[in-house]
Amino acid sequence: MIGVIDYGMGNLYSVSKALERIDAPYFVSEHPDELKRADSYILPGVGAFRDAMEILTENGLKTFIQAAANEGKPLLGICLGMQLLFEESEEHGASEGLGLLKGKVVKLKDCDQAGNRLKVPHMGWNLLKVHRDSPLLPKAKEGFAYFVHSYYVSGIEEEALLASAEYGVCVPAVVGLGNVYGAQFHPEKSSTVGMLILERFKQFTQEQKVKK
C-alpha cells in the first residue's frame, strides 16, 4: 500500500489517477498516524521549498518522513517533493530540507555556457539520459519526460544521480540511494517513461514488503 502524503502543496489528483492506471493500491492522508500503515510513500509537490518545509514541520510530517525513510520504507519525491529530499534550498532565502540526500537546491540559470538565453522556468519535454540501473529505471530505458521547475539540485553525490536532462546545466532528473528516490519531472504526466517509474516503484514497494 502506497501512502500519498498530502500537505496542501501537491498535485494529488494527477498522481492518484496515475496510480489507479497501474492498479497500485494507495491512499491519501495528511496525518502521520494514518500514514504509518503504508508500506511506502509518495511525496508530491508544487510551489515554494520554504513554504513546503514550514507546513511539513508544523504538521509533524517532517519528522515522520525522516523516520519512515530511516526505517527503510521506500519513498518517492516528485518535482518539489524531490527537492525537499535534499539538505537545503536557496529559494526565498536559505532553508533546510529533509536531509535524506546530499545536495543543495539552486535556481536555474537563464543562459547556457555559450550565452544562449534560456527560459526559466524550464517547462516542457526534455530527453532523459540514464546513468545507471536502479529500482526505478533501467539504464537502457531513455525517453522524454515533462518538466516544470525553476530550481534544480546542485552538488548531488555521483552515485545518487540516476538520470539527468540538459538545460544549460546538468539537471538531476531521477535521483536515489537505498530506499529514497525522486523525480524532478512529473512521472504522472510523462507518458511511457513516467508510468514505468511509477510501475517500478509499485514493484519496489512490494519487494521491500516481502523482505520484511
From Swiss-Prot:
Iron-sulfur found in the keyword field: no
This protein's UniProt keywords: Amino-acid biosynthesis, Cytoplasm, Glutamine amidotransferase, Histidine biosynthesis, Hydrolase, Lyase
Pathway given in the UniProt record: Amino-acid biosynthesis; L-histidine biosynthesis; L-histidine from 5-phospho-alpha-D-ribose 1-diphosphate: step 5/9
Quaternary assembly: Heterodimer of HisH and HisF.
InterPro entries: Class_I_gatase-like, GATASE, Imidazole-glycPsynth_HisH
All residue ranges annotated as the Glutamine amidotransferase type-1 domain in the record: 1-211
Keyword match Transcription: no
Gene Ontology biological-process annotations: L-histidine biosynthetic process
Record EC number: 4.3.2.10, 3.5.1.2
Protein's cellular compartments: Cytoplasm
Protein name as it appears in the record: Imidazole glycerol phosphate synthase subunit HisH
GO CC, one annotated term: cytoplasm
Active site (catalytic residues): C79 (nucleophile), H186, E188
Purpose: IGPS catalyzes the conversion of PRFAR and glutamine to IGP, AICAR and glutamate. The HisH subunit catalyzes the hydrolysis of glutamine to glutamate and ammonia as part of the synthesis of IGP and AICAR. The resulting ammonia molecule is channeled to the active site of HisF.
Swiss-Prot/TrEMBL catalytic activity: 5-[(5-phospho-1-deoxy-D-ribulos-1-ylimino)methylamino]-1-(5-phospho-beta-D-ribosyl)imidazole-4-carboxamide + L-glutamine = D-erythro-1-(imidazol-4-yl)glycerol 3-phosphate + 5-amino-1-(5-phospho-beta-D-ribosyl)imidazole-4-carboxamide + L-glutamate + H(+); L-glutamine + H2O = L-glutamate + NH4(+)
GO molecular function: glutaminase activity; imidazoleglycerol-phosphate synthase activity; lyase activity
